[in-house]
Amino acid sequence: MRRVLVVGGSIAAATAAGTLRAEGWDGELIVASDEEHHPYSRVPLSKQILMGTQELASSALPELPQDVDIRLSMRAVALDRMNREVRFADGSVVGFDGLVVATGARARRIAVPGQHGELVLRTRDDAAAIIARAETAATAIVVGAGFLGMELASTLSHRGLDVTVISRFAPLSQLLGPWLAAELTAAATRAGVRMLRAPGGVTLIGNPVDGVACSPHGALTADLIVSAVGDIANTEWLSSSGLAVAEGVVVDQHCVAAPGVVAAGDVASLRTGSGVSRRTPHWTSAVHQAGAAARALLDPPRPHRALPAPYVWTEQFGVDMKIAGQLPAPGTPQVLQGDPGQGSAVVQWRSDDGRPTAAASLNFRIPIVKLTSLAR
């Protein structure tokens, strides 16, 4: 294998490239990203950077080895697997012996065609746009109450904005389960954030956007409106490639999509033992998958297993919550340490036959390895 092409500029792309070099592979290595920025972490965008305690530049990931050819503003438009080539929007074509698909995902939008001014948070440029608006805003509406929506609401509230969160479902309940979701919702309410349910969904109004409409609440306006309603894997450029796509690029437990082609991060959809494929769009999953994907390219006969990392983390409304295991976690957990009522605890869920299935810490310092062990 003489040349590996990594398409993408995310943590998965950077980790895959770094792993190839760390494993001693010294062939030609190209990282082609559609962004104009060198690879960076998205984790602080909704937290420290939006809060203003860190500069945008601080999100940059560690530099890749100097012999890695990083090409920016390169948007992939087609993959020719037979000829082992990727075509880019500028007309250039890059051949490869091994390919890492790490094109990530983009923010899902709810604006109608031709409607301008919808703000989302996915990239550094998105963060810069929200920060610019927040500097003069007094009120904010966040549409969506998943991890990103709630973290946005937390940071904007901490900045002093009057924040309303609107969601179709109970905040975080579908992701975390009732107990954990209730803990974070209660913290949001204590912080003065209004939580509104809109089972029929939300429509953006104005052009440019200056409000929302939803039932049963009618029309609402705010100085700052941000949509946080999920993401869409960037797979369009693979439509004629013959690769299986189900929400993301379907890969096996070794992150292999096809011979010589691997995928990792938010764009990858791992096939489970039951045959169902699902994405796990979390930072730890991206890192784990990218390392395994790179090793699978180097060592196809003995690829490394890349199960979705059973660990997520969020920080919002004064709650530092780390969670390991199967989510959503049903019912009420057992308290192992601390006291949830006092704001600091370690809790655990067990199945009907007594097996640990999940564990979480709330403002409680515990090593990730130990927390993960409590979920198995």
Predicted regions and their residues:
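FAD-site-proximal beta/loop scaffold in flavoenzymes
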Residues: 116-137, 211-214, 219-287, 292
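Beta1-alpha1 glycine-rich phosphate/pyrophosphate-binding loop at the start
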Residues: 2-68, 153-175
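FAD-binding core/adjacent interface of flavoenzyme oxidoreductases
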Residues: 1-5, 61-139, 213-216, 226-228
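Mid-to-C-terminal Rossmann-like scaffold of FAD/NAD(P)H-dependent oxidoreductases
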Residues: 2, 269-366
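Rossmann-like dinucleotide-binding cores of NAD(P)H-dependent redox enzymes
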Residues: 139, 149-203, 308-312
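Glycine-rich Rossmann-fold phosphate-binding loop(s) that bind the pyrophosphate
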Residues: 8-11, 122, 143-146
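A short, polar/charged loop-to-alpha-helix boundary motif
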Residues: 365-376
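Glycine-centered tight beta-turn/hairpin loop motif at sheet-sheet or coil-to-beta transitions
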Residues: 89-91, 215-219, 316-318, 354
